[in-house]
Amino acid sequence: LSSWKPLTAPVAGFVALMGVGTLVPALAGVMGLALPFFGLILLGYVLGKLLDIEEAGLGWMNAFIIYLALPALYFNLISVTPISELANWRFILVTSLCTLTAFAAGIAIGWFAAGGRLDEATIQGVGAGYSNVGYMGPGLTLATLGTASVAPTALIFAFDSAIFFTLVPFLMGIANGAKESFARTGLLAMKRVLTHPFNVSIMLAALAAWAQWTPPETIHKILVWLQNAAAPCALFVMGVTVALRPVRGVAKETPLLLLVKLVLHPLLVWVAMTWVGGFNPVWVYTAVLMAALPPALNTFVMARQYDVYVERASNLIMAGTVASVFTVTGLLYVLTTSAGR
């Protein structure tokens, strides 16, 4: 029975939100959008706490998600998107600058919290600026804003990944005395960005959109099946991953980092895109929603890769995911009301 104790609060919170959606008709629509996503995360969390299965068991499911399911989702939706939408450099510039600003704010917080340790500050910056654009982003934006959100979702994923997979190795190289040359570090980072399965699928989809090519019926059906599995599998794995991380208290800087990630980052995106102007409203809503997502699981992956801030990165992701149930749900209400859905 002791294994049920960690489940009491998240399950009770989820049931309470369902009750709110039932009792307040105005919120029923947004709860219907948000709760299935967080419900799948909760299911993964529950099984992760109850079943005695080693974390290594997630390996093949992660491979399925990263190499097949999410790439299929990106390919299917982007390949039918007009190529002109995929070359929206104003959008790329604005959203990337906002991400860099949130990253820099997180590094500044981490610098003071860690007593000037650049390696720890860098991981904290990742937690403050890198949204969960891979596992949560595509399914949530598609369900909320429709197929018009696919192109901006893909662009944000591709360029946010490029930012963090490039800057983090450089900053860690500086923090660790630059044991490898910056040129070699840059080449390795670029290789990692260009060969990431998500980015490969985005590039192939853009090529297909440019050539107006459609896959044969058999291939198309396989891609559709994979696409349909993407969101449920990704969210379930996210829940299990969070459940398997040890929680031993919240670091003093965590609330500030989450304030940047969940509140200031989306607010900055909204202000910047409104100020620049000329964007399709769906693209604005997509960018704001992507910025409001909790810290990416890659925060923990990078922390473990460099063996720094590992446990606190795990706690940051868990706290951010729990807090985002309320912040993202509130944002969804605002967006769906603004979009007239």
Where are these regions (language model features)?
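Alpha-helical transmembrane segments of multi-pass small-molecule/ion transporters
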Residues: 1-341
